[in-house]
C-alpha cells in the first residue's frame, strides 16, 4: 500500500465531507445523507481498485498500468452510484439512455465534484468545471435539472458570503 495514495483517499473523503456539510449547513437540500457520505468511495480500498489507482497516479503510466486503471475505474463507477456513469444504460435495442438518479446520489455526486474546490480553496471552481464537462455527461433531464438547481443555490450562497 502506498502512503501517498492512502493519504489522497483520506484527504478526498474529508473534502467530500466538508462539501456535504457546507451544503447541509446552508440549507441547499432537505435530504440528509450522513451515513452515505461516511462510506463515500470505500471501494477505492478494494483489491480491484487500490493498486491500479496507486500505480496510475503515483507510478509510471505504462500501457499495462493504463489498462489496469481502466478496469479499476469501471469497477469504481459500477459500484458507486454517486457517479453519473452508473446510471447510463447501454443496450442493443434502444442504444444509450440515462436513468434518473435518486436525489441522495446527486447530492453525493456534487459533494464529490466540489471536494476538489475545497482542496484548492477556490469554492467557485466547481462552476467552471461543470460548464467545461457537462456536455460529456449523459444525465437524465430531471437529474440535470436537479444538478443545476443545486449548483445555482451553491453559487447564490457563496455570493452572499462574498457580499
Say what each PLM segment does:
Residues 1-163:
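Metal-dependent phosphohydrolase cores
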Amino acid at each position: 500500500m502506498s502512503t501517498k495514495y492512502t493519504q489522497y483517499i483520506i484527504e478526498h473523503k474529508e473534502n467530500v465531507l466538508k462539501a456535504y456539510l457546507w451544503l447541509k449547513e446552508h440549507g441547499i437540500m432537505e435530504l440528509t445523507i450522513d451515513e452515505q457520505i461516511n462510506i463515500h468511495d470505500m471501494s477505492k480500498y478494494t483489491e480491484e481498485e487500490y493498486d491500479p489507482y496507486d500505480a496510475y497516479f503515483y507510478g509510471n503510466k505504462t500501457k499495462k498500468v493504463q489498462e489496469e486503471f481502466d478496469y479499476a475505474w469501471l469497477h469504481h463507477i459500477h459500484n458507486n452510484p454517486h457517479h453519473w456513469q452508473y446510471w447510463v444504460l447501454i443496450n442493443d435495442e434502444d442504444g444509450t439512455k440515462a436513468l434518473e438518479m435518486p436525489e441522495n446520489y446527486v447530492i453525493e455526486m456534487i459533494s464529490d465534484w466540489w471536494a476538489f474546490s475545497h482542496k484548492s480553496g477556490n469554492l467557485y471552481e466547481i462552476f467552471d468545471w461543470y460548464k467545461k464537462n457537462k456536455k460529456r455527461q449523459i444525465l437524465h433531464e430531471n437529474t440535470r435539472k436537479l444538478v443545476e438547481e443545486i449548483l445555482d443555490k451553491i453559487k447564490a450562497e457563496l455570493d452572499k458570503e462574498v457580499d
